Amino acid sequence: MMFLLRMLMRRGRGAAMDPLQVSMTGVRMGERFLQIGCNDKSLLAGLAAKVGLSGTAAVAAFNANEARLAASIARKVGALIDVKDIQEGRAWPIDDAAFDMVVVDDTAEGFVNLDQPLDVLRNAWRALRAGGRIEVVTPVKNAHPPIDFQKLLTEAGFKPVRILAESNGLRFVEGLRTDL
């Protein structure tokens, strides 16, 4: 699998893949992961390659542009990525406890434009299995007033919640779905 990651990095498809971003998520081969938002092409490509054919890769796209980008990435890297069209304020077409990991790609700070970001995170909580993890990837230096993802994740039901790391201009915030 590392061979595939290195090959994708060398080919220069889209943005240069940062293995740190992929490894910080903790996604493992064979896992079922859902990425919310599709702003960082290299993150999605790396995560899809990491879970491999024995895992499941899916993207929850808020709009047609994100859906097209995710489908394009899937074709370019030869990965099976299920693109889910989601609408804010509506139930998502995703089964309960369907995923081991949710990655929120907020590198373009799209959460600022959402009317109800807490509902998005509650849907993510519902989509995770008990013991599943969520990770939010967001810029350290925000163009907009920063969103307190630790607070939002806690309000959505994730416990514990922590800043996992800040590196290369990105902040990684992690939460766990517990059913206590």
Language-model regions: role of each:
Residues 48-49, 116-130:
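A short glycine-rich, Lys/Arg-flanked "PGG" loop and its adjoining helix->strand segment in the class I
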Residues 34-35, 39-91:
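Class I SAM-dependent methyltransferase SAM/SAH-binding core
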Residues 11-31, 42-46, 50:
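Conserved alpha-helix/loop element of class I SAM-dependent methyltransferases that forms part
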Residues 28, 89-103:
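A short acidic, Gly/Pro-enriched loop at the edge of an enzyme's catalytic core
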Residues 3-19, 38, 144:
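Conserved SAM-binding loop and adjacent beta-strand
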Residues 156-180:
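Core SAM-dependent methyltransferase catalytic element
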Residues 100-115:
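A short SAM/SAH-binding and catalytic strip from SAM-dependent methyltransferases
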Residues 131-139:
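Conserved beta-strand signature within the Rossmann-like core of class I S-adenosyl-L-methionine
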